[in-house]
Amino acid sequence: MAVNRTPVLKRCRSLEMDPVYLGIDKKSRRKAKNAGRKVSEYGMQLREKQKAKFIYGVLEKPFRNYYKKAERQKGMTGENLMIMLELRLDNVLFRLGFARTRKEARQIVDHKHVLVNGKCVNIPSYLVKAGDVIEIREKSKSSARYKEILESTNGRLVPEWLEADADALKGSVKSIPTREVIDVPVNEMLIVELYSK
């Protein structure tokens, strides 16, 4: 799988994005190289797409596939796209506070530590549905890793569309989120404009 090895804070600077959206509380004191430079319309559209891909850790081909699915659904394409990205299993694990970052959540899912409705799921891109119950498997719960994770994600707010029981390392999807409650700094309309060309 393709991996972008650019340092995280450097990418955040270039995308003019706060690293807190990735679960990282570091701040860069440097300015982006091109700060203040006028960006073209295409440049702005491309930046929004790169931002969404970077936040959710999705590569170009899967991202394009999400867009095509979003286009076929009823409603607004941009909103459908953001909702689909938000419903990825790795993102839900991150939102529940069972992983410090989405990257760590992907690793936890890959290593078969996660159960969805009692069944092991090791696909980070698995899309959860309303009513799904997500938990860390029993064998893994006693691991020191999860104690550390819960300590560092203790102050993180769980979105209203999810319910988390940190002590049991268990959560559930109460409802499908609306765009208004998805807290990511992405203008999805620019992504739609980019793909509509």
Swiss-Prot record:
Residues 87-147 form the S4 RNA-binding domain. PROSITE patterns: RIBOSOMAL_S4, S4. GO terms for molecular function: rRNA binding; structural constituent of ribosome. Keywords: Ribonucleoprotein, Ribosomal protein, RNA-binding, rRNA-binding. SMART domains: Ribosomal_S4 (SM01390), S4 (SM00363). Gene3D superfamilies: Ribosomal Protein S4 Delta 41, Chain A, domain 1, RNA-binding S4 domain. One of its GO terms (biological process) is ribosomal small subunit biogenesis. GO terms for cellular component: small ribosomal subunit. One of the primary rRNA binding proteins, it binds directly to 16S rRNA where it nucleates assembly of the body of the 30S subunit. HAMAP family: Ribosomal_uS4_B. Part of the 30S ribosomal subunit. Contacts protein S5. The interaction surface between S4 and S5 is involved in control of translational fidelity. Belongs to the universal ribosomal protein uS4 family. This is Small ribosomal subunit protein uS4. It comes from Lachnospira eligens (strain ATCC 27750 / DSM 3376 / VPI C15-48 / C15-B4).
